[in-house]
A protein has these predicted regions:
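Juxtamembrane intracellular "pre-TM" segments in multi-pass secondary transporters
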Residues: 5-16, 193-223
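Helix-breaking motifs and short loop linkers at transmembrane-helix boundaries and internal kinks
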Residues: 50, 82, 103-109, 120, ...
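Conserved MFS/SLC helix-loop-helix module at the cytosolic interface between two early adjacent transmembrane helices
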Residues: 69-108
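Helix-to-loop junctions at the C-terminal end of transmembrane segments
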Residues: 71-82, 270-282
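Structural signature of the two symmetry-related core transmembrane helices
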Residues: 85-99, 285-300
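Cytoplasmic helix-loop-helix junction between adjacent transmembrane helices
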Residues: 113-152
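Helix-loop-helix hairpin linking two adjacent transmembrane segments in secondary transporters
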Residues: 147-190
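C-terminal membrane-cytosol helix-exit motif in multi-pass small-molecule transporters
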Residues: 179-198, 386-393
Length: 393
C-alpha cells in the first residue's frame, strides 16, 4: 500500500514527464505507423509493382491478421514471462522486417515481410495499456491512458501526411520509418521500469482464472461496448464518411484526409485533458456523455449540404472519441489483477479487432439496403445502445 505522502507527491507530479510513460508513448507512436504511414503510397505501389488495386490491400490484411490469432496467446506469455520479454523482441521484429520492406521490389516477398512485421506488432497495443495499468491507478490511470490516447491520435493524424510526403520521393520510402522500433526496443530493455508479475500457477489454472474474470457481468458489458465502438468507428466513420465526402461532395483524397485528420487532432486534445475531466465526472458519466456525442455527430452528418459544415460533427465526434477510448481501456485495466492483466487486455484488444473487422462488412450491408445515410443513423443507433449498456456497468 502507498502512504498518504506518496500519493500526494504522485498527484502533484506531471505524469507525462514520467520516463516510463514517455517510453510507452514511443511504443505507441511506433506500432500505429504499421498501416497509416504506408497507405498514401498505395497508388504508386499499384503502378510500380504492376498489381491490382484490390491486391494492394493485402499489405494491410497480412499485417493485421497475426494480431487476431496471436494477441491472446502473447498476452498469456507476457503474464508468465514478463512484459519486457515480449515487447523487446516484438519491437525488433517490427522494426527489422519493416525496414527490409524498403529494399524489396517483389510484391510476394513484400507480403511475407509485412506478415512478419505484423507478428511483431501483434502484442504491442495491448501490452502498452497493460503496462499503464501496472504502473498507475485511479485518477493517475485515467490521466495516463488519456495522454497515451492523445499521442496515438496525433500519430494517426500526422502519419498519413508524412507517408504521403515520403511516397512522393519513392513508393518504398514510407517503409523505412518503422526502423525506429529498434532503438525504442533498447529503451524498453534498459530504461523501462515495470513490475514484472511472478506467476507460478499452471497454464490451465491461469486460463481458468482469466476465463472466470472475463465472465464477470461488468467485463462482458465492457467487451460488448468495445466491439460496438469499433463497429461504429470502422463502419460508419472510417468506411462510410470518406465515401460520402468523395461521392456526394466530390472532394479530393487530400481534402478527405485533412478532414478526417481533424477528428484525430480533436481527440488528441480531449484525451490530454482527461486527467482534469476525471476530477469533475466519474468514468461512467464520461462514457455516457461520449455516447451521446457519438450519436449526435453521426446523426448530423447525413443532414449536411455544404462541405464546410462538416467541422461541426468532426469536433463533436473527436471530443467523444477522445473521452471514450481511454476510459474503456482504464476500466479494463482496473478489472484485471496484475498477474493476469496482459492476458486480460489482450482479449479486450482482440474484441476491438473483431469490431474493426465486422464494422465495414455490417455497414456495407446497411448501405445496400438504406443507402449511405442509413449507415450513419445505424451508427447513431449503436451509440444509443452503448449508452443504455453503460447504465448497467
Amino acid at each position: 500500500m502507498k502512504s498518504g505522502e506518496e500519493e500526494k507527491r504522485k498527484d502533484k507530479r506531471k505524469i507525462y514527464l514520467d520516463t516510463n510513460l514517455q517510453i510507452i508513448f514511443g511504443i505507441t507512436l511506433t506500432y500505429i505507423m504499421g498501416v497509416s504511414i504506408i497507405t498514401p503510397a498505395f497508388p504508386k505501389i499499384v503502378k510500380e509493382l504492376n498489381i491490382s488495386a484490390k491486391d494492394v490491400g493485402l499489405l494491410i490484411a497480412v499485417f493485421s491478421f497475426p494480431g487476431i490469432l496471436l494477441t491472446p496467446f502473447l498476452g498469456v506469455v507476457a503474464d508468465r514471462w514478463g512484459r519486457k520479454k515480449i515487447i523487446f523482441p516484438s519491437l525488433m521484429l517490427f522494426g527489422i522486417a519493416g525496414g527490409l520492406c524498403f529494399f524489396v521490389r517483389d510484391f510476394k516477398l513484400l507480403l511475407i515481410l509485412r506478415l512478419i512485421q505484423g507478428i511483431g506488432a501483434a502484442p504491442l497495443g495491448s501490452l502498452t495499456v497493460t503496462i499503464i495499468g501496472d504502473l498507475y491507478s485511479r485518477k493517475e490511470l485515467i490521466a495516463a491512458m488519456g495522454y497515451n490516447s492523445s499521442i496515438r491520435s496525433m500519430g494517426s493524424a500526422s502519419y498519413p501526411a508524412i507517408g504521403g510526403a515520403l511516397a512522393m520521393v519513392g513508393w518504398h520510402y514510407p517503409f523505412i520509418l518503422p526502423v525506429i522500433a529498434v532503438p525504442i526496443g533498447f529503451l524498453v530493455l534498459f530504461n523501462l521500469k515495470t513490475p514484472e508479475p511472478e506467476n507460478e500457477v499452471h497454464i490451465r489454472e491461469h486460463l481458468n482464472i482469466v476465463w472466470k474474470k472475463l465472465r464477470n457481468r461488468q467485463v462482458v458489458r465492457l467487451l460488448v461496448i468495445g466491439i460496438i465502438i469499433f463497429v461504429m468507428l470502422f463502419g460508419s466513420y472510417m468506411t462510410c464518411f470518406p465515401l460520402l465526402l468523395g461521392n456526394s461532395f466530390g472532394l479530393s483524397s487530400l481534402i478527405i484526409g485533412l478532414i478526417m485528420a481533424g477528428v484525430s487532432l480533436i481527440a488528441a486534445v480531449t484525451s490530454s485533458q482527461l486527467g482534469k475531466i476525471i476530477k469533475f465526472f466519474s468514468k461512467k458519466i464520461i462514457l455516457k456523455i461520449s455516447f451521446i456525442l457519438y450519436a449526435l455527430a453521426l446523426s448530423i452528418i447525413p443532414l449536411i449540404s455544404q462541405p464546410w459544415l462538416f467541422f461541426i460533427p468532426i469536433i463533436i465526434f473527436g471530443i467523444a472519441h477522445g473521452m471514450n477510448i481511454p476510459v474503456i481501456q482504464a476500466l479494463f485495466a482496473e478489472a484485471a489483477p496484475v498477474k493476469y492483466r496482459a492476458t486480460f487486455m489482450s482479449v479486450s484488444g482482440m474484441t476491438f479487432r473483431v469490431g474493426q473487422t465486422l464494422g465495414p462488412l455490417l455497414m456495407g450491408m446497411v448501405i445496400s439496403i438504406w443507402g449511405i445515410g442509413g449507415a450513419f443513423y445505424a451508427g447513431a443507433g449503436l451509440s444509443i445502445v452503448m449508452f443504455i449498456i453503460v447504465f448497467r456497468l
